[in-house]
Amino acid sequence: MILLHFVYSLWALLLIPLINAEEFTPKVTKTIAQDSFEILSFDDSNTLIRKQDASVTISFDDGETWEKVEGIEDEITWIYIDPFNRHDRAVATSMYESRLYITNDQGKSWERITLPDSEKNISSRGCYIETHPLNKNYFLAKCNYCEKTEVDNEENSGDEEGAPVIFNITHCTDKVFASNDGGKSFSEIKSSLERNENSAISISDCGFAKTGKDSDLESSDTSIICLFQNMQLIMDEFSSPYTESKLVLTTDWGKSLKEFDQFKDKVVNGYRILKSHMVVITQGDRYNDMSSMDVWVSNDLSNFKMAYMPTQLRHSMQGEIYEDAMGRIILPMSRERSDQEEDKGIVSEILISDSQGLKFSPIPWTANEVFGYINLYQPTYLKGTMIASLYPLSRRRNRKGKAKGVKNKGVTKISVDNGLTWTVLKVVDPDNADSFDCDITDFENCSLQNMFYTREGSTPTAGILMTTGIVGDGSVFDWGDQRTFISRDGGLTWKLAFDFPCLYAVGDYGNVIVAIPYNADEDDDPQSEFYYSLDQGKTWTEYQLETTIYPNEVMNTTPDGSGAKFILNGFTLAHMDGTTNFIYAIDFSTAFNDKTCEENDFEDWNLAEGKCVNGVKYKIRRRKQDAQCLVKKVFEDLQLFETACDKCTEADYECAFEFVRDATGKCVPDYNLIVLSDVCDKTKKKTVPVKPLQLVKGDKCKKPMTVKSVDISCEGVPKKGTNDKEIVVTENKFDFKIQFYQYFDTVTDESLLMINSRGEAYISHDGGQTIRRFDSNGETIIEVVFNPYYNSSAYLFGSKGSIFSTHDRGYSFMTAKLPEARQLGMPLDFNAKAQDTFIYYGGKNCESILSPECHAVAYLTNDGGETFTEMLDNAIHCEFAGSLFKYPSNEDMVMCQVKEKSSQTRSLVSSTDFFQDDKNTVFENIIGYLSTGGYIIVAVPHENNELRAYVTIDGTEFAEAKFPYDEDVGKQEAFTILESEKGSIFLHLATNLVPGRDFGNLLKSNSNGTSFVTLEHAVNRNTFGYVDFEKIQGLEGIILTNIVSNSDKVAENKEDKQLKTKITFNEGSDWNFLKPPKRDSEGKKFSCSSKSLDECSLHLHGYTERKDIRDTYSSGSALGMMFGVGNVGPNLLPYKECSTFFTTDGGETWAEVKKTPHQWEYGDHGGILVLVPENSETDSISYSTDFGKTWKDYKFCADKVLVKDITTVPRDSALRFLLFGEAADIGGSSFRTYTIDFRNIFERQCDFDITGKESADYKYSPLSSKSNCLFGHQTEFLRKTDENCFIGNIPLSEFSRNIKNCSCTRQDFECDYNFYKANDGTCKLVKGLSPANAADVCKKEPDLIEYFESSGYRKIPLSTCEGGLKLDAPSSPHACPGKEKEFKEKYSVSAGPFAFIFISILLIIFFAAWFVYDRGIRRNGGFARFGEIRLGDDGLIENNNTDRVVNNIVKSGFYVFSNIGSLLQHTKTNIAHVISKIRGRFGNRTGPSYSSLIHDQFLDEADDLLAGHDEDANDLSSFMDQGSNFEIEEDDVPTLEEEHTSYTDQPTTTDVPDALPEGNEENIDRPDSTAPSNENQ
């Protein structure tokens, strides 16, 4: 019995505390408020403040009671706690101009601070105070001012001072004021940039160099860093603001400013001052705010070094840059998102520097994974711990467009050793294992995934963490499936806390936890509640709230996490006039009967499982989980105990700058980093020893490791002081080949998409520096299609019926399923005016592609592929015709080529409602059709196996294209559309189709594409329809072609093709061979020396031989520049025997730059030119920065590779190039890419006037040294003059000016239809043919009443010449049929008005004559005094001025007639005398008649008038009278059987100028590819 009593007593003694614990209820106090969403707490105090409406309220008892503060008279917009004086100082900003309120005693009293008065018509948008970490009296006030509008001034003219105003944000200015006396007085730190009238925004951003009490930066307490910027937002053609900036240092409160020299010629985008580093970010291109950026790092505010970046930084989140405990810089990067996407500005990549801050690298396991949102969380109280999450930017959609979850796998990982090793977040929770959809013991495929772990607001605990997320393999993440988890070991393992997501907060160092569901209905109870745990999350108790609220925040009232009191702030939308807040103060301080923990209630918890981190072992003393007490050390920070590790290990080291970690984690030399470092600058030897490891800065291990040096090769490494030193190369190696690549044509970044030999897709957003694999979920990519009208869009076709679409250059992909049809490999057809509308072609009834029932179906989508509808059966090619024409007959028109299953013919049909009800057959039988440059051209079969072409410019009216009748044009069996810009179509009509011996005629159309003339004969083509034809980009009218010079022999199969290159400068009217340079690249004369270009000229390999049709001669960006591989001689030699040539004046003069064939690429609008050997291994490239005058070699890799291709962005405006190469490795070959960055070789960016005016770096100049007229005008182009600066994102092609319009010459005209150019240069009618029926124009334009006959010439459409020759002068007008009456009315004159005018003139003449006779002759004696009157005689009657005028007229008339009479008499006498002598000497021989003399005289005068035009019109005898209709001589016109040539005979050359004349520098932009060849055959 005694024993039982003892047991009962012991049981009661043990159970009572547990009963008390279970019965414990926290004290909860509710406060109702309006519009209060943020509560702030002073550190180490019970005082809280919050903004309620426009006032400030305060609580001195941890939120149980609240009152309005005294001393603040204004309405308040914002309050914040001073981060350096969190115990007692807060600031409230006033709604009114230039006023703030500050407290230094935890809100008990407030002092009003007034900043200096603003200028007239300037309004403040608010001010912010920044304080100093060491001196409480040091303030920096930052204010933003904007110009007041006229409405502001009117409305507020009579208001009291300080009244709120409306401001105009179009012109805003930042101002910074400094105070060193606690705000009693302020002085402005004025910007050192002068604001001009174009500046829309002026920014001043200043900050103290000391950012914390533990700052390691070498600076004084009064050091202030300021960044001043002027930005112009509206820039006409420019898409980005122009920015100028200055970064300065002041130590005397702004009285003097010292600019940082390293950034004088750069655009500083922003800066960040950290504990031991200052980071400065500069913008690569001042004219493109999306250009790549450079990161500069300093630890003394004096010397800055450029950090190495593994990728291009384009959108930094400067406010998020921070420094971890090791001194490493954490650099988050955002990206530009598509306008269609909702979430923007999300961190897309995180780079982490080494401890020196100079070499950045991505989180290792995210470097080559799918691109996505990245989040990094580093709890400061858990040294070495990092939690990172990757959320992919690719989502899957089904056919109906409903989201089915994340397509690519996301992942969350943790590291406890500063990122050296990473593991997944393991779920160790056997009790809840069945509640998860995967096996939680399979950690790699079943772990906790958390997408957003915030760095801010974390409360220190002894390894106790909470988060929300889902458990799985990362392939599915549905926000509705999130649950709440808890960890007690610093995040290594987790267990389930709640089946729903919660807001949470911890107190008493993690011993008290409060959690509230986001949604009150989560637990099937509509009322709100919160849960709390007093045993570190082991058990939970529910506390019911009487009101349903939306929780806004839950927080511990002590920021250091030591207290046990909490604030829960929630709101309800029940009231129509706004939100109502319910603020709950929750007090756990009396838990466990108010018991305080004793020593035996604690245990040691070791960070990182007891391993060394930073050379130290860390531990924390924490309460045991089941202890029945609270720590109750309120306002004491969590204590971390350190024990230095005796021996240093590799974990305490990082790779030296010149080394990188390989796949095994070993630090190996990196050639590109060696080039950037200075290790080879200090030695003349071939190798230099370098230690691969360096101790991490700040590591505390005691005994360093012995690190052996590695010999680094310095052969080929550029030395300091050379430009080559500044070139940055990034190498990537692959175990596959890249078979396809294409850039997205935007200035936003340098994104490109690549497909390898395995059908895998890879994406790079930095020009190939970093390359990421696209996860297609196991599907092979079988085709890639880029949208030609929307440069950020592309579509990838998967082998299993998926289509992956991107509209943001490959950052994110949407996945949809194609219709249930067989993929036929046909390209998509896009709507030019609707991004999400396109047509897909699939095979129906195609169990086998050879099945007779298998046929194509056109499917239409209007939502980017989410849904498809069947549009037209048997359609094999469609066009959104209405979106292509300038003036379509119907904007919704669609044209389709249809091939019925039962027929071998194809038809062309159209519809205006996507073939729902409207279907119109345009042609019953066609070969094919294509669209180009606003035309649609249809090839229609004709009798005798011939073709006919029909053209439309509106989709309704079709006209037959009339080809010229010529002796060498047989059947029209094949033609190729070459180009269709500037109102004409260039077409190649094949005249010989024998494989390997193909050639034909080059034709050009009129403006509506219906009438063609021959420009050149025997132009080379290949069997695939490609033609040696290339229009020079960026310049008008310059075309290069290759002709088959022995076409007759080739057609007869007697000889192989012999090609010659010809050039035209007036769009094909005249052709010449290329003038060769005098000497080769070695200064030697060429072997052929004939002065005839027919025998010795330059020839280039053309379009038909290119491996990649995008490798054009020219670039629209590099104006006038062309590269080509060819030779000087009578004909073109084989490719391997040729050299590389270059021109800067559009092909007028050339120079040999390399003795062997090279590949070329243009950069920076021609400011940087790069050559690389073709078909031979190399380790070097050649580059030029002076427009090809001089060339330098640069070694870009350690071993030789065979370069397959060199490329850059389509606009050729970047300073980065991408090389694709293949190198021999042990056991085989490896494919490699090299990104070569030339940004740093230029001293600065050229200074450009955005209005296009000349500046110190840009001048207007003609393309060549000769000021020739081209297309009737002389043009000058804006060109860079300084080779030491780079151009950047400036569209120089937009800046040219016409000096004058020239007189028309022969070069401004071309032959009209049915006319040909004869050997003498004139246009003559083909014998047997008639000119085109001029009256046909009356049928096309019914309103015309007249027409004109052709002169045989027509003016080149591009020509703007004025005056001069008028070879196209119209004939006399003829009446249009049926318009004779209107014609007669236009040109006839009625008799009545004509008679009236004639009689009136006669009367005027008669009256004037009578008046002169009456006043001047009759009154002075009549004609009797004729012989007496002399000039100046007196005696004439002159009573007034009229008499004097009349007498002067009479005297002058008599004088003139008198002299004429004398001259006639004298001439008569002399003639008679001469005739007498002639007759005496020659007897009866007769002389020339009078009319013959007059005619001869006219001819002499005509010769004078035509002086200077002889070479312009080779035979002008027919055109002496330019005012009348020309007659076309037919004496020299050959018959159809005769032979004639289509080009002007080549003049002999006496002096061929050297290429590359001085001053011929130019740069502009081109597309990445030429127009594709389109052939109908």
From Swiss-Prot:
It is found in: Golgi apparatus, trans-Golgi network membrane; Prevacuolar compartment membrane. Gene3D superfamilies: 2.10.70.80, 2.120.10.10, 3.30.60.270, YVTN repeat-like/Quinoprotein amine dehydrogenase. It comes from the Eukaryota. Belongs to the VPS10-related sortilin family. Residues 22-1391 are lumenal. Pfam families: Sortilin-Vps10, Sortilin_C. Glycans are attached at residues 121, 168, 445, 791, 1008, 1301. It is a single-pass type I membrane protein. Residues 1-21 form the signal peptide. The chain crosses the membrane at residues 1392-1412. BNR repeats lie at residues 58-68, 101-111, 179-187, 414-423, 485-495, 531-541, 762-771, 859-869, 1141-1150, 1183-1192. It comes from Saccharomyces cerevisiae (strain AWRI1631). Residues 1531-1577 are annotated as: Disordered. One of its GO terms (cellular component) is Golgi apparatus. Functions as a sorting receptor in the Golgi compartment required for the intracellular sorting and delivery of soluble vacuolar proteins, like carboxypeptidase Y (CPY) and proteinase A. Executes multiple rounds of sorting by cycling between the late Golgi and a prevacuolar endosome-like compartment. Binds the Golgi-modified P2 form of CPY, and this interaction is dependent on the presence of an intact CPY vacuolar protein sorting signal. This is Vacuolar protein sorting/targeting protein PEP1. Residues 1413-1577 are cytoplasmic. InterPro entries: Sialidase_sf, Sortilin_C, Sortilin_N, VPS10, VPS10-sortilin, WD40/YVTN_repeat-like_dom_sf. The keyword Repeat applies. GO terms for biological process: Golgi to endosome transport; Golgi to vacuole transport; protein targeting to vacuole. Keywords: Glycoprotein, Golgi apparatus, Membrane, Protein transport, Receptor, Repeat, Signal, Transmembrane, Transmembrane helix, Transport. CDD domains: Sialidase_non-viral (cd15482).
